[in-house]
Amino acid sequence: MVQAISEFSGRRPLVLTVPGLNGSGPAHWQSLWEQSRGDVVRVELGMWDTPRRNPWVTKLDQAIRSAEQPVLLAAHSLGCLAVAWWAELAGQPWGWPVAGALLVAPPDVDRRDMPAEVAGFAPTPRCSLPFPSIVVVSEDDPYSSVQRGFDMARDWGSHFVNIGACGHINAASGIGLWQEGQRLLDRLIGTAEGPMAQGAGLNEILASLTHEEAGLRTI
């Protein structure tokens, strides 16, 4: 494994977008990133309207394993839960093959009023993720509270970012290409291109990303 990490260290990572329930439409930031960036492709999980945890995790695992370079995950909504479940079940070592993840608007699947389609993703995994990660939440997300998002970030060992009132951080939020999110993603890319070491990189990434530059608030 050390040899494999050494072989691919320094290569620009592939960014895999992981949409949530019903997929991501053409105006969603994930779709726009896929169209505008040469390093971003979508994971075709299938069953977008009737998601199932195990098939989604299997499809995600196949996409990750087939990449011939480090992988970063840019997940939205229920896609964040697919990533968390993959991390719990896959048992990867620190930072390989997934070198980092941007987890945007993870829903609280443990709530009783959540859509029935997401029930199979409960309970929310609580294991620490084996890669640097950033959880991004909104103050008026109908599918999760700021506190619940903070709890997930704490359990997963993720940095926590609150961007204020931005709904579910999707196409309806009117954020277009979501430049702030791309800045966070690019910081993760920066550390994935360097040597991989447990616990290294994330603090430096976020320390260099000022609030003014990103337009974000952290707590």
Task: Enumerate the predicted regions with their spans.
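Gly/Ala-rich beta-loop-alpha elbow adjacent to hydrolase catalytic centers
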Residues: 73-84
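Conserved alpha/beta-hydrolase "acid-adjacent" motif
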Residues: 25, 142-148
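Conserved alpha/beta-hydrolase fold motif
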Residues: 72-73, 101
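Short beta-strand/loop motif that positions the catalytic acidic residue
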Residues: 129-137, 141
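Catalytic histidine neighborhood in serine/cysteine hydrolases
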Residues: 39-41, 154-170
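Active-site catalytic motif of lipid deacylating hydrolases and related acyltransferases
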Residues: 2, 9-69, 193-194, 198, ...
